[in-house]
Design a protein with these regions (language model features):
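Small-molecule pocket liners
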Residues: 18, 44, 83-86, 91, ...
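Hinge/capping helix and adjacent helix->loop/strand transition within the periplasmic-binding protein
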Residues: 1-54, 103-108, 117-150
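Paired acidic/hydrophobic, glycine-rich loop segments that form the ligand-binding mouth/hinge
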Residues: 19, 65-69, 84-87, 177-179
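An extracytoplasmic/periplasmic, membrane-proximal ligand-sensing/linker region
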Residues: 38-42, 79, 105, 128-189
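Beta->alpha turn/N-cap motifs
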Residues: 52, 69-74, 89-91, 116, ...
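A local structural motif
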Residues: 16-19, 38-51, 55-65, 155-160, ...
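Short helices/loops that flank or line small-molecule/ion binding pockets
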Residues: 11, 35-39, 53-67, 72-80, ...
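Ligand-binding "clamshell"
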Residues: 42-43, 77-88, 95-108, 180
Length: 189
């Protein structure tokens, strides 16, 4: 909670003085920060880059004050002491940064399910029995210890699901991000 109140207080004390990087307009990083701004009252200006590398370079160099990024991509910079992780999204702490509290632990529950996810998709007319068989096969592979370990090392959390659960997640994310885009008046470049 300390970091949030300090950030918000600083942004109120000097309006327009704080900024944040993202790898581009409308990216998950951009939307996550807009959701955080809305939930916390933070006043910060978006600085969109053409990709993650420029955003990270300017964060490390101090040209921007903050950004959302994956723990995995920020880890080399945190280990060198050039970047400090302030909070993680998700319902539990990151295995790669167990000492960093979640947003929820710091009083911002709206960031709980802000995370990147990967899914395997098939064409809409794929037969249901084939979808179910492929899903079972993918779950079997994802539950193998060596696969879990490799993905965890890359900062991912293995959460296999059913096609129906994926459909629910997609609908829920679309509704949440549509509201963020509308409220923040984000327009396509």
């Amino acid at each position: 909670m300390l970091f949030r109140s300090a950030l918000v207080a600083q942004s109120k004390r000097s309006p327009g003085s704080m900024n944040y990087a993202s790898p581009g307009n409308g990216t998950p990083h951009h939307l996550a920060m807009e959701l955080f701004k809305s939930a916390s009252g933070l006043d910060a200006t978006h600085v969109p880059y053409k990709g993650i590398q420029g955003a990270l370079t300017d964060l490390v160099g101090g040209q921007v004050q903050m950004m959302f990024g994956t723990v995995h991509s920020l880890k080399p910079h945190t280990q060198s002491g050039r970047v400090r992780l302030l909070a993680t999204t998700g319902t539990s702490r990151s295995a790669q940064a167990p000492d960093v509290p979640t947003f929820k632990e710091q009083g911002i529950a709206v960031m709980d399910h802000v995370d990147a996810w990967y899914a395997v998709m098939a064409p809409a007319r794929t037969p249901s029995d084939l979808i179910q068989r492929l899903n079972r096969d993918f779950i079997e592979v994802m539950n193998q210890d060596d696969v879990k370990a490799a993905l965890t090392q890359q900062g991912m959390v293995v959460r296999p699901s059913t096609p129906e659960q994926l459909g629910t997640l997609i609908k829920s994310d679309l509704a949440r991000w549509k509201k963020v885009v509308t409220d923040a008046r984000i327009a396509a470049d």
